[in-house]
């Protein structure tokens, strides 16, 4: 699943036989379309499309032409957008870390997989637009997110890849169905804020 890192990582070059993307996220980039894509060999795709036993029979309807055209149009700027998402995320990751806020971003040398990621990513497109900070408690996380909304610095949303910065507290949103003891084992704290960094030029 390369939804979080189109262009930044090319899984086929790393040995992947099948790559999937959510077109809803970075590839479309405007949060107005729902879709996905499966990439593989022609033989694999033909098997998926087989009307008798192909898995695509389970994946939903065919996208309408207007949405398809919208995604194709937005793909023309994907290379520019991914560079800016990555640039902004790197800037903010450095700023958060300089403030002694626990920051998780693969572009930081402090990230445990930084050196591994450097061997996999396409330098031209950076380390991607997703980062996480831990401010210590849910109360602080909520205060940060409320302040960001007041200052019009982004939107509270669990999506990603939008041109505007999106943020959410995983413990009370995307990970809320995971029991608290399992969240702790996974390193998820109440103070986590997940950011999908936008295209802002300031």
Listing of model-derived features with the role each one plays in the protein:
Residues 71-80, 128-136, 194-198:
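Short, well-ordered beta-strand elements within core beta-sheets of diverse protein domains
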Residues 3-5, 108, 198-200:
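Active-site beta-loop-alpha junctions enriched in small/polar residues
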Residues 80, 84-91, 186-201:
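Hydrophobic/aromatic-rich, well-ordered segments within soluble, folded domains that form packed cores
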Residues 45-46, 78, 138-141, 174-175, ...:
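Short, acidic Gly/Pro/Ser/Thr-rich loop/turn segments
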Residues 91-98, 152-155, 202:
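Short amphipathic alpha-helical segments with coiled-coil-like heptad repeat character
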Residues 102-193:
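Conserved C-terminal alpha-helix-loop-beta "cap" of PLP-dependent enzymes
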Residues 28, 34-35, 59, 160, ...:
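Short glycine-rich loop/turn motifs that provide flexible caps or phosphate-binding loops at active sites
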Residues 1-104:
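Conserved PLP-enzyme active-site core in the AAT-like
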